[in-house]
Amino acid sequence: QGVBGBEEGLFGGR
């Protein structure tokens, strides 16, 4: 679910 810079989850991401 988007951790750090993965997708768009916990810390926003992308």
UniProtKB/Swiss-Prot annotation:
Q: Which residues carry this modification: Pyrrolidone carboxylic acid?
A: Q1
The reply to whether Heme figures as a keyword in the UniProt entry is: no
Coarsely, its chief localization is secreted
Cystine pairs: none
Q: What are the annotated GO cellular component locations?
A: extracellular region
Keyword annotations for this protein, in alphabetical order, are: Adaptive immunity, Blood coagulation, Coiled coil, Disulfide bond, Hemostasis, Immunity, Innate immunity, Pyrrolidone carboxylic acid, Secreted
Which BP terms does GO give this entry?
Answer: adaptive immune response; blood coagulation; innate immune response
Kindly provide the PTM information from the record. Answer: Conversion of fibrinogen to fibrin is triggered by thrombin, which cleaves fibrinopeptides A and B from alpha and beta chains, and thus exposes the N-terminal polymerization sites responsible for the formation of the soft clot.
What compartments host this protein?
A: Secreted
Subunit info here reads:
Heterohexamer; disulfide linked. Contains 2 sets of 3 non-identical chains (alpha, beta and gamma). The 2 heterotrimers are in head to head conformation with the N-termini in a small central domain.
Domain remark from Swiss-Prot or TrEMBL? A long coiled coil structure formed by 3 polypeptide chains connects the central nodule to the C-terminal domains (distal nodules). The long C-terminal ends of the alpha chains fold back, contributing a fourth strand to the coiled coil structure.
Question: What's this protein's function?
Answer: Cleaved by the protease thrombin to yield monomers which, together with fibrinogen alpha (FGA) and fibrinogen gamma (FGG), polymerize to form an insoluble fibrin matrix. Fibrin has a major function in hemostasis as one of the primary components of blood clots. In addition, functions during the early stages of wound repair to stabilize the lesion and guide cell migration during re-epithelialization. Was originally thought to be essential for platelet aggregation, based on in vitro studies using anticoagulated blood.
Q: What is this protein called?
A: Fibrinogen beta chain
